[in-house]
Amino acid sequence: DKTLSPNYMQKPLFDAYDIDEDIFWSEVNALPDYYKRAGISVQRDTCYLGHLLSYVRAGRMPGLTNARLRELGAGIEFFAGIPELFSALRASIALPHYEEHDIRLEHYVVSTGLVEMIRGSRIADYLDGIYGSEFIEEPAQPGYDRAHAPKHGLVSQIAGFLDNTTKTRALFEINKGVNKEPGIT
């Protein structure tokens, strides 16, 4: 949504696969009305995820894996001063006056964007956590072996997503410490 970057964070993905960004977003913006004709309601701010998977299935994004998304994250352009701002803010509270009061500063990205691309970006090392949208590569099949890790492959399903309302839930979880202490409910 252009909070930390002058471009949509998916731009390096579109550039890598020679996808016209304007056409992609135009298609995405038309999807709610398109699916409404079939009686299906889609989330406006996250339906782009399913459309990315349509591009993968159509062969327009060959070889798109979570690892590839992470690689492409290195190409996300940030506004001037980002990521330096993160370390400057941390340094500003690394003073005895703040430490004696146990004041801590944590940085999180809460986004409808792609977690793997953020993990591969220049800001990842400055973050305490990333909340966003993720893909499954090889889905578990009926009767899958629970003792083994999932296999790798092309992204094929949406694992989870944040939309503009669930971002608020993520903020409450961070505030409460659920991300640090899973036993907290």
Where are these regions (language model features)?
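Alpha-helical substrate-recognition element adjacent to the catalytic core
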Residues: 1-145
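Conserved acidic, metal-coordinating active-site core of Asp-based
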Residues: 122, 130-185
